[in-house]
């Protein structure tokens, strides 16, 4: 069964061309310098409509489906994982707004998300609250006309460039209530190279890979947000509201993994045809042929599972199980494929002369962020043991 139509493939061709012309020529150099995605690239992505793939036309989006969204993420990530990731936060915020936002919040933010002028970042994780997000302690205290936010957040990716932060905070001070006392807020700020906000301090976290989008530790001190920044105008619903975004976020993450895996496979395949040892191309040696075969199997299995989960969501069905499976499979596949690609290149795979080492470093993060593989397995197990 094919989940991808000719229209999907036509869209893929356009994104592939964009990636080859705009992303691939600059990715390795910027990665090596640990520099961020140039804003010119963000602007060009916006002009192509990539930020608005899932949003309705009434909000200046393209009104397309989740399969298209996964294809865009996949093709951009083939060039550089971080470029394919820029859209993830928009997908999360847009999903939150469409499901739970007030009419005013939708009108205020969704058109900007669709056109790339609103660049969000997610401030959910805390130093002592990772997978156990219900244990977070950041406070949102009611005050005249709004709330004061106080506390710390961690691993807030793209916090510097973002002009709005999605912040999950505790509106009920009783921590024993766990997820029942959390609320979602939108905190507006200036987009800059560093964190620019009078009451928010932040420092970037050095990372092994996933360069192009810096992740930050943030400290909030009496950050005032007006009442209309509370998602849906409802307190203590933030955890439940956030759950609606998990499916799309995990689909998009699985697609990013497939993109990185495809890039590594393509490079290793071409190298194996050109590199000669023992008087013939190494692709003619059985050991290398077996590696290439296994890599292809894992790649297509991850891709098709991702498309299948996306097709379920497009049909209006829940796909939290399938999206979780797709993310787990894609995370495993990208680690395996990038590792094997390095092995096929031998010493050159460990060299910064070729991009395979970048694929390897970038691919490793997939099993950690957007819900660890261990958490995904818990979700899967609960579903099958009902």
Feature locations, PLM:
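Alpha-helical interface subdomain recognition
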Residues: 1-79, 83-84, 100-105, 112-117, ...
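Short Ser/Thr-interspersed hydrophobic loop/turn segments at strand-loop and sheet-helix junctions
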Residues: 49, 73-77, 168-170, 187-194, ...
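Flexible, small-/acidic-enriched active-site or ligand-binding loops
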Residues: 193-222
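Helix-loop "lid/cap" segments that line or gate small-molecule binding pockets
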Residues: 91-100
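Long, acidic (Asp/Glu-rich), low-complexity accessory segments flanking structured domains
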Residues: 221-240
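A short, Trp-centered hydrophobic/proline-enriched beta-strand micro-motif
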Residues: 116-125, 168
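Short Gly/Pro-enriched turn/cap motifs at secondary-structure boundaries
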Residues: 86, 113, 128-131, 155-158, ...
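A short core secondary-structure module
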Residues: 150-200
